[in-house]
Amino acid sequence: MALLKFNNIGIKAIAATVPHRVIKTTSLTDYYSSEEIEKFVAATGVEERRFAAPDVCASDLCYQAACQIFDETDIRREDIDALFFISQSPDYKIPGTSGILQNKLGLSKETIVYDINMSCSGFIHGLLMAYNFLQQPSCLLYTSEPTRL
């Protein structure tokens, strides 16, 4: 396993927002047998999940969490240099959700924004990218959109 070490970088604040609707895993008997549900809960420990309403996007949850940070800490919108949005459920295919959040939060147009399409490991991957962004004096970026008929 690679060992990554970052100096002089830290996390100043963490906020979380979760949807209000709770679905118990044991209530999914219309989709899975009781035996399958028991095995799933035993293997994962997931006894319930939170589900957003149909009109709630991933950016809505991020916006609420970001507002908590701005309202409850000394971190100011104008201090934000980069915004990383990580999800496997972006608001739209295009434009990127990070740009939507940048605008909705009133961040500077100079703020660098990134969308990272990942699931479970996305948070760690995003931390790695943010730390690298803060430590490296230069960066190389490739992008490609192979348009096909």
Question: Where on the chain are the PLM-derived regions?
Answer:
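Conserved "HGTGT" condensation-loop signature of ketosynthase/thiolase-family condensing enzymes
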Residues: 1-81, 103-105
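Conserved beta-strand segments that form the floor/walls of ligand-binding pockets within enzyme
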Residues: 10, 84, 115
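Conserved catalytic cysteine-centered active-site region
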Residues: 37-60, 88-140
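A generic secondary-structure signal
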Residues: 68-72, 129-133, 143
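Short glycine-rich or small-residue beta-strand-to-loop segments that form or flank ligand, phosphate
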Residues: 82-88
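Conserved small/polar residues in nucleotide/adenosyl-binding loops
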Residues: 142-149
